[in-house]
Amino acid sequence: MRVLPNNDELDFDHDSLKNNSYPKIINKYNPFRIKKNIKKYSITSIIIIILEITFIFVTFFLSLQRAIKTIMKRKDVKNYIVKKNDVKDLKVCLCTPLKLENKYIKDFVQFYQKIGVDKIFLYDNNDKDGEKIEDIIPEYIKNGFVEISDWRGKQKQLMNMMDDCYQRNYKIYDWLIFYEVDEYIHLKNYTNIKNFLINEKFDTCPKIYLNWVFHTDNDQYHYEKKPVQERFPQKETIPADKNGRHNFVKTIIRGHLPNLKIDCVHRLVRDVPGCNGNGKEVQLRLFRMPEQDFENYYIDHYFCKSVDEFIEKLNRGDAVWGHKKNFIVGTFANYFGYNKMTKKKIEYVEQKTGLDLSEFKKMLNNDKKS
């Protein structure tokens, strides 16, 4: 609050009044100054000021309303948590949208079956005349471990596919995992995911956030018919400050929570609280978790694989926006941010894509000189 000056502060030469040379302190607190200045404003300016003030109040009101709604939803959601004390009673499923993943899908399915997932729902978003998942894992489909939903030929459907999986299954399963084919959960000291999820530290947690740990291309150029864990063991070096891309999360959410809609790829439902892998409730910054864990509980993210496979990934298009990611220099700036940049690799990318990566060559030369 602004405090008016006392009499001592207003001590000045009265002759200055005759010369209209008001001291700054008087002019600052002069109540008539506002009226004089109003005359200088045009009607348009006054309208703009009124609109700005209105916008501030409306924004504040909406923020307050959202905060109240979030608090109420937090309380409401936690009332629906169903606790299970026996691993045998716990039911866990995996929801995975995919496109052009036939090379990797069998290893992915086998991995999650091995760690105790009860069922996998694959959302087939391939082109209508594209590859078919049924050709690769017929035995898992036949025995009911994998169920395929047909979303072939549809664009910009990632969020809808994820929400569809939740709405169809939240009454049946205690936990629903929303991971993609290049994401493998890592649980130190746990060989079965149910033993991890049934832990009492998650008794009041509607969601569990785990960080991505990126794996590099291991300087590989071509596809090899081996599991990605064998091909790409090298992890990206994580800086001490653990900022930026290193605190991206993906989410496991409880079932039996009604009136929810999946509205975010990373955090699933924005207004529902979540915990880290240690059971501590955390506040995300957008879809980043400041309190990371890269040692005990995280997701091995094989996002790029080899150079050829990364180019194929760009060609298949984006499941959120629907368009194909053009071969732009910025795309490979991101790629080389994770992976070792060499002259050979730059020239290979240029040859495969037609890109001009001369700026990267300059950067490489500058690094060698320094």
Region annotations inferred by a language model:
Residues 97-100, 125-128, 151-154, 181-182, ...:
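An acidic- and aromatic-residue-enriched active-site/binding cleft used to recognize and process polar
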Residues 110-119:
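Short, acidic, metal-binding catalytic loop of nucleotide-sugar glycosyltransferases
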Residues 116-117, 172, 180, 204:
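Short loop/turn motifs at secondary-structure junctions
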Residues 11-110:
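N-proximal low-complexity "stem/linker" segments adjacent to membrane-targeting elements
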Residues 158-163, 187-370:
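Catalytic-site signature of metal-activated, phosphate-bearing donor transferases
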Residues 119-124, 146-148:
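Short hydrophobic alpha-helical runs that function as membrane-insertion/retention elements
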Residues 129-178, 186-187:
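Active-site-proximal specificity loops/subdomain of glycosyltransferases
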